[in-house]
Amino acid sequence: MSNVRVSNGSPSLERMDARQAEYPKPSACRNLFGPVNHEELTRDLEKHRRDMEEASQRKWNFDFQNHKPLEGKYEWQEVEKGSLPEFYYRPPRPPKGACKVPAQESQDVSGTRQAVPLMGSQANSEDTHLVDQKTDTADNQAGLAEQCTGIRKRPATDDSSPQNKRANRTEENVSDGS
């Protein structure tokens, strides 16, 4: 039985010594296709972006740059905001890890919500929606951290060691029960 070798998946010491004797492995970061030409890459990216914009403009007959409908197979109509489902204009959800803020805290002192125009592709010049005004993201995260340190479901323990579920068993119980 002394000839039998049981492997645990790792190489034997002899193989490890032989591997170290070889020249050291090169870095895993390799330049497979030569140096990057950043100007050419930027030009290609711009061309691809323009091609995608033109394809979308042809497909939907809508000028997404100027937010204007174009002539084509679709007939665009302006719609009142109240006739749309809420999910088209409500503010995005907070991240999953964020605490829930009571409604009273997100309102100003008079208890009213402020109308804030949307930015980017969601906004038209006349669109304003009732949303809570956002400040700097660092301020929001600091505020959430302060709010999250409130009531806990289970108090934090001062012990550095985790509690063992079997801690109340004595040695007699352990030897009798097994």
Curated annotation (Swiss-Prot):
The listed location of motif Nuclear localization signal is 153-169
- Phosphotyrosine (modified residue): where? Y74, Y88, Y89
Q: GO MF annotations for this entry?
A: cyclin-dependent protein serine/threonine kinase inhibitor activity; protein-folding chaperone binding
Carrying Phosphothreonine, the residues are T157, T170
Residue ranges of region Disordered? 1-31, 87-178
GO terms classed as biological process: G1/S transition of mitotic cell cycle; negative regulation of cell population proliferation; negative regulation of cyclin-dependent protein serine/threonine kinase activity; negative regulation of mitotic cell cycle
Where is this gene product found? Nucleus; Cytoplasm; Endosome
Q: Which domain of life is it from?
A: Eukaryota
Q: Which InterPro entries match?
A: CDI_dom, CDI_dom_sf
- Which residue windows are coiled coil? none
Location of Phosphoserine modifications = S10
GO CC annotations?
endosome; nucleus
Question: Mind telling me how this protein is modified after translation?
Answer: Phosphorylated; phosphorylation occurs on serine, threonine and tyrosine residues. Phosphorylation on Ser-10 is the major site of phosphorylation in resting cells, takes place at the G(0)-G(1) phase and leads to protein stability. Phosphorylation on other sites is greatly enhanced by mitogens, growth factors, MYC and in certain cancer cell lines. The phosphorylated form found in the cytoplasm is inactivate. Phosphorylation on Tyr-88 has no effect on binding CDK complexes. Ubiquitinated; in the cytoplasm by the KPC complex (composed of RNF123/KPC1 and UBAC1/KPC2) and, in the nucleus, by SCF(SKP2). Ubiquitinated; by a TRIM21-containing SCF(SKP2)-like complex; leads to its degradation.
PANTHER family attached to this UniProt entry: CYCLIN-DEPENDENT KINASE INHIBITOR 1 (PTHR10265), CYCLIN-DEPENDENT KINASE INHIBITOR 1B (PTHR10265:SF9)
The protein's name: Cyclin-dependent kinase inhibitor 1B
Instruction: Look up and give the organism this protein is from.
Output: Neovison vison (American mink)
